Regions:
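A late C-terminal transmembrane helix in Major Facilitator Superfamily
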Residues: 483-513
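C-terminal ends and interior cores of transmembrane alpha-helices
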Residues: 171-191, 428-447
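Intracellular helix-loop hinge segments at the cytoplasmic ends of transmembrane helices
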Residues: 213-221, 377, 470-479
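Intracellular loop-helix junctions on the cytosolic face of multi-pass helical membrane proteins
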Residues: 2-75, 185, 195, 209-361, ...
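Short amphipathic helix-loop junctions that connect adjacent transmembrane helices
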Residues: 93-135, 373-391
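Helix-to-loop junctions at the C-terminal end of transmembrane segments
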Residues: 149-165, 403-424, 441, 511
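C-terminal transmembrane helical hairpin of 12-TM major facilitator-type secondary transporters
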Residues: 421-470
C-alpha cells in the first residue's frame, strides 16, 4: 500500500522508496477525499466520546448509583398522584374568578349606581393611591405575584437543584398554598376584597413555587428508574456495552412515558374533581342568587386547596429524598444562583440559535400568560361569574387540552411532523387567539364578549394552544447541547419567571387608562407578532452544528481542567473537578466509538413530550 505525497509530486511506498510518478488531477482529488473521510471519522469519534461523557455527567447526581434511590413503582405513582392535586383549581382557576367577582361587587357598591351600566364609565376601586378598574386590579395582583416570585427564586431557586432541602421546600409551598386556598372558605363578603387580593397573590406565589420544586424532582426520578440505571451502567462499563445514542434514546423514552402517564392521570383526576364540584354546586344552590353564587365560588377555591393537600400526602411520605448537586467550593445557596446565571449567560453567546429562541421565548411566554389572564377576566364577565357555568367551561377546557396535547404528539409520531413545523402550527393558533381579542377592542359583537365565544375559546385554547406548554419545552431541548441541560434550562426558567410580571403590569396600565378591558390586546398582539419574526431565521440544523462545536470546546476545557487548569468554564455542570466528573470523563473516552452521533429528536421527533404547565 502506498501513500501519495502531494507536495513533492512523488509516490512514497511503505518501505520508504520513492518513484518519479507524477500525480494526476484525479489522484489529487482521490487524496483529498481520503483525507476528508479520515478527518470526518475522527470528528465523529471525538464528538461521540464527548456526547457519552456529557450524558453521564449532566446530572452530577451523587445518588445516581446508590441502590436505596432506585425509583419504585409505589414512589412513581405517588408522584403521579401529587399532580392531580397540584392542578391549580384553587389558585389558578377559582381564586382569580372569586377575586374578580368580589372586586366587581365592591366597585359597584362604591359607585352606588353611577357606573357600570349602559353608557356609564367602568366602576373603579381606590388602591395604592389610584382609582383602578377591576380588570386592572386583577392584572396588577397577577404582576405583583410574579414579581415577588422572581425576587424569591433568585435567592431560594438553587435549593431545587443543590443540597437536600428540595423536598422540604416543596412541603412548605404545598402546605401554605393549600392553606391559603382553603382560606377562601371565609372570604365571601365584597368588603373583604383587599383580603382577597392578598390571598390571590399568595396563591400565585405558592402554586408556582410548588410546581417548580415538584418538577425539580422529575430528572432524579427518571434517572432512578431501573431501565435507565441499567443503561447508564452499560454505558459506563469498560468497554462500553451500549452506545451514547442508545442510552439517550432509552432515557428519553422513559422521560416521555412518565410525563405522558402523569398528564393522563392528572387530567382524569381533575375531571373527576370537577364533576364532584358540579354536584356540590347543585347541592348548595349556587345559581339561586348573587349571594349563593359568591359563596359557591369560595367553596370551589377551598375544595381546590383541600384536594391539593390530600393528593400531596402520598408523595410527602413515599418520596426518596435524593440529594441534589454539591455546591461548588466558595459558594452558598444564595450565591450559587448567580453563578448559574453567569455561566448560562456566558455559554449562550456561543449558541446563536439558542439565544434567538431564548429571546422569542421571553416575548411569547409572557404575552400568552398575560393574554390568558385578560381573556379569563372577560370570560368571568360574560358568564356573570356563575360558578356553575365557569365549572362547566373548565370541564370542556380540560377535555380539550387532553385531546389537543396527545393528539399533536401522536400526529408528530405517526406522520413524522418535525418539532419546528408542529411548533409553527401552535404559534399560528396563538396568533389567531390574539387577533380575535384585538377585534374585540372595536366591537361588542364578538372578540370575547359573548358567552358562546368562550365555549369555542375553551376548545381552541385547550385543543390547539395548550400544546405550547409541551412543545415549547421540547424546542428548548432541541437547541440545548447534551450534558448542559441544567444550565440552559435554568436560564430559560429564570427568563420565564422574570418576564412573567412585565405583561400584567403593562396590560394593567393600559386597561386602567382606557377603561376598556380588551385594550391590552394592542400590546399583546404586537408582542406576539414581534416574537413570530424571530422564528423566521431560527434554524434547528444550524443549532445542531453549533451544539457539536460547543461540545468540542467543552471537551478541550475539560481536558485542561483535568490537567490542573481553571475550573469555572464549560467543564462539568458547574465546573467542579471532583472524582465523579473525572471518572465520567474517563468513561466517556471509551464510550460508543462505532456509531455516528445524531441528535435525539431530529429524525421526525418521536421525543416530543406532551405536558401542560400553568404559568
Amino acid at each position: 500500500m502506498s501513500v501519495a505525497a502531494k507536495d513533492s509530486g512523488t509516490a512514497v511506498t511503505d518501505e520508504g522508496a520513492t518513484s518519479d510518478v507524477k500525480m494526476t488531477p484525479k489522484d489529487e482529488e482521490l487524496l483529498a477525499q481520503e483525507e476528508k473521510k479520515a478527518s470526518s471519522s475522527d470528528d465523529v469519534e471525538t464528538e461521540e466520546n464527548v456526547y457519552a461523557a456529557a450524558l453521564l455527567s449532566s446530572s452530577a447526581d451523587p445518588a445516581a448509583y446508590q441502590e436505596k434511590y432506585i425509583t419504585s413503582r409505589v414512589e412513581l405513582w405517588s408522584y403521579y398522584v401529587y399532580y392531580i392535586g397540584n392542578q391549580g383549581l384553587g389558585p389558578f382557576n377559582y381564586g382569580p374568578s372569586q377575586l374578580q367577582n368580589l372586586l366587581t361587587l365592591a366597585a359597584e357598591a362604591a359607585g352606588n349606581g353611577t357606573c357600570g351600566g349602559t353608557g356609564q364609565a367602568e366602576c373603579r376601586l381606590r388602591w395604592a393611591g389610584s382609582a383602578r378598574t377591576v380588570e386592572s386590579l386583577v392584572l396588577l395582583a397577577n404582576g405583583i405575584g410574579f414579581a415577588i416570585q422572581v425576587a424569591l427564586f433568585l435567592f431560594i431557586g438553587s435549593l431545587a437543584d443543590f443540597g437536600s432541602y428540595r423536598p422540604w421546600i416543596l412541603v412548605l409551598f404545598t402546605v401554605v398554598g393549600a392553606a391559603t386556598c382553603m382560606a377562601w372558605f371565609g372570604v365571601t363578603d365584597p368588603a373583604q376584597w383587599q383580603v382577597a387580593m392578598g390571598l390571590y397573590i399568595m396563591n400565585n406565589i405558592t402554586y408556582q413555587g410548588a410546581l417548580s420544586f415538584y418538577s425539580a424532582a422529575f430528572p432524579g426520578l427518571v434517572r432512578g428508574l431501573p431501565e435507565v440505571r441499567d443503561s447508564a451502567e452499560k454505558l459506563s462499563a469498560k468497554p462500553a456495552q451500549t452506545t451514547a445514542e442508545e442510552h439517550a434514546r432509552i432515557e428519553s423514552l422513559q422521560r416521555n412515558r412518565v410525563v405522558n402517564i402523569s398528564f393522563g392521570i392528572q387530567a382524569a383526576g381533575e375531571i373527576v374533581i370537577l364533576a364532584v364540584i358540579q354536584g356540590v354546586l347543585s347541592g348548595i344552590h349556587a345559581d339561586q342568587d348573587a349571594a349563593h353564587n359568591t359563596r359557591a365560588l369560595s367553596v370551589c377555591a377551598g375544595i381546590g386547596g383541600a384536594t391539593w393537600l390530600l393528593f400531596a400526602l402520598p408523595w410527602f411520605f413515599l418520596e426518596k429524598h435524593r440529594p441534589g448537586q454539591k455546591l461548588p467550593k466558595g459558594y452558598n445557596y444564595l450565591t450559587v444562583a448567580w453563578l448559574q446565571l453567569r455561566l448560562a449567560c456566558k455559554h449562550i453567546w456561543k449558541l446563536k440559535q439558542t439565544l434567538l429562541y431564548l429571546i422569542f421565548y421571553f416575548l411569547l411566554s409572557d404575552t400568552l400568560n398575560t393574554a390568558i389572564t385578560v381573556i379569563s377576566t372577560l370570560q368571568n364577565d360574560a358568564a356573570a361569574f356563575s360558578a356553575t357555568v365557569l365549572n362547566e367551561l373548565l370541564i370542556v377546557g380540560i377535555v380539550s387540552e387532553t385531546i389537543g396535547i396527545f393528539g399533536l404528539w401522536y400526529i408528530q409520531k405517526w406522520f413524522g411532523v418535525s418539532t419546528l413545523n408542529a411548533f409553527r402550527w401552535v404559534i399560528f393558533c396563538i396568533v389567531v387567539l390574539m387577533v380575535w381579542g384585538f377585534i374585540g377592542i372595536f366591537t361588542q359583537k364578538f372578540g370575547y364578549h359573548n358567552q358562546w365565544e368562550f365555549w369555542v375559546y375553551q376548545f381552541w385554547y385547550g385543543g390547539l394552544v395548550c400544546p405550547w406548554y409541551a412543545i415549547s419545552f421540547t424546542m428548548i431541548g432541541e437547541v440545548t447541547p447534551a450534558g448542559y441541560e441544567f444550565l440552559i434550562f435554568s436560564l430559560f426558567g429564570l427568563i420565564g419567571k422574570s418576564s412573567s410580571f412585565v405583561g400584567p403590569f403593562v396590560s394593567s396600565a393600559i386597561s386602567n387608562r382606557t377603561g376598556n378591558p380588551s385594550a391590552p390586546f394592542y400590546f399583546l398582539l404586537f408582542c406576539t407578532l414581534a416574537s413570530c419574526l424571530l422564528l423566521i431565521p431560527l434554524d434547528l440544523q444550524k443549532s445542531r452544528i453549533e451544539q457539536a462545536r460547543f461540545l468540542d470546546r467543552a471537551k478541550e476545557e475539560k481536558e485542561r481542567a483535568a490537567a490542573g487548569g481553571a475550573g469555572f468554564g464549560l467543564e462539568g455542570s458547574l465546573g467542579e473537578k471532583d472524582d465523579a466528573v473525572v471518572r465520567v470523563r474517563s468513561v466517556g473516552t471509551d464510550a460508543a466509538k462505532t456509531e455516528p452521533r445524531t441528535i435525539p429528536g431530529s429524525e421526525g421527533d418521536s421525543n416530543s413530550t406532551p405536558h401542560r404547565t400553568k404559568e
